[in-house]
From Swiss-Prot:
It comes from the Viruses. GO terms for cellular component: membrane. It is found in: Membrane. This is Uncharacterized protein L487. Glycans are attached at residues 72, 94, 234, 315. Keywords: Glycoprotein, Membrane, Transmembrane, Transmembrane helix.
Length: 330
């Protein structure tokens, strides 16, 4: 029978062997963890060094821009790179290391830093308008021909630019007495140096955004009608003897009036201008080609009202002439 003292010695030796085994495994794992940690710290130190150099370079660039009068702050201040690892149980001398990705908070902070460091000029494309000589000449000619000062032209020339495009946009404001249906919008007429064309013309309109590229001038249709009542009344009478050009111009006038449901009895007479002729001819062509007259016609026939007014004027003139003759005979 084995004595108890020998059993104690054998147990002690076995415990020492187990302790030595675990000590060896733990020391090996510490060496592996130490090397991994050192590599991680080396990587972070390189990243910090690159960030420091980039900050120095960007600071010099910002100083140069400040000297030139361009203030912009684009310093990089990203959060610390977060790489952590967790070791599993040691099995057969192998150590598995898991790297965690950055958390949501760190990602959000990094994105906020990137958005703050962006150049605000890249985020908004702002083009300062530059007035052109073409727009100034056009407004001057318009004011001279029509005979009245167009309000807001000085501020309009400062706030709108044509970007070297020799085309400008005229927005036609119809009189308040005209009730235009909702499905028909007012026409924007593009003015060139030599002719005028409609914005909706597919042959002369390479871009649908010509209105944003040119200068916009407000033209009141009521003023054009007021300035040309005599021309209208004379040319609507077919029996009067006028030249072909004047008669053609009267037809253009009538085409417009037939499409506008308004009473022109309150229009005052004035002289005719070349600019008004150009506008009226352009609107007439637009009405012939693009707008159906039935959609704009009213229950009251404008032609009939004009002819009635002409007959009333003639009757008054006849009555006055008869009265004068009777006075002379007496």
């Amino acid at each position: 029978m084995i004595k108890p003292i020998y059993l104690i010695i054998i147990g002690t030796v076995i415990c020492l062997v187990i302790l030595y085994y675990f000590y060896h495994e733990i020391s090996d794992s510490k060496k592996l963890l130490t090397s991994t940690y050192q590599k991680n710290m080396l990587l972070e130190s390189k990243i910090f060094e690159l960030e420091r150099k980039s900050n120095v370079f960007i600071e010099k660039y910002d100083n140069l821009k400040n000297v030139r009068g361009q203030k912009n702050s684009s310093k990089i201040d990203s959060p610390v790179l977060s790489i952590t690892y967790h070791s599993d149980m040691v099995k057969n001398g192998n150590l598995s290391v898991k790297y965690d990705e950055m958390g949501n908070t760190e990602v959000n902070e990094l994105l906020q830093k990137i958005n703050k460091n962006r150049d605000p000029k890249q985020l908004s494309n702002i083009h300062q308008p530059i007035p052109t000589k073409t727009s100034h000449n056009l407004v001057s000619k318009l004011e001279q021909d029509v005979g009245y000062k167009i309000p807001g032209t000085s501020s309009l020339l400062q706030n709108n630019c044509a970007q070297n495009i020799q085309k400008n946009t005229l927005h036609i404001d119809y009189p308040e007495s005209i009730n235009i249906p909702q499905n028909i919008k007012p026409n924007n007429i593009v003015v060139d140096n030599e002719f005028m064309m409609d914005e909706n013309d597919e042959f002369n309109n390479p871009s649908k955004n010509l209105e944003t590229e040119g200068d916009i001038f407000e033209v009141d249709m009521n003023n054009i009608f007021k300035n040309n009542k005599i021309k209208l009344l004379n040319n609507t009478d077919k029996k009067l003897s006028y030249s072909d050009s004047e008669l053609m111009f009267g037809n253009d006038y009538q085409d417009i009036l037939n499409s506008l449901p308004n009473d022109i009895s309150d229009i005052s007479a004035n002289s005719l201008s070349s600019f008004d002729e150009t506008v009226i001819k352009s609107i007439s062509e637009n009405l012939k080609n693009n707008i159906v007259s039935d959609s704009l016609s009213a229950s009251i026939d404008v032609r009939k009202k004009v002819e009635d007014k002409i007959t009333r004027v003639k009757n008054k003139s006849k009555i006055s002439s008869k009265s004068r003759n009777s006075v002379v005979k007496k």
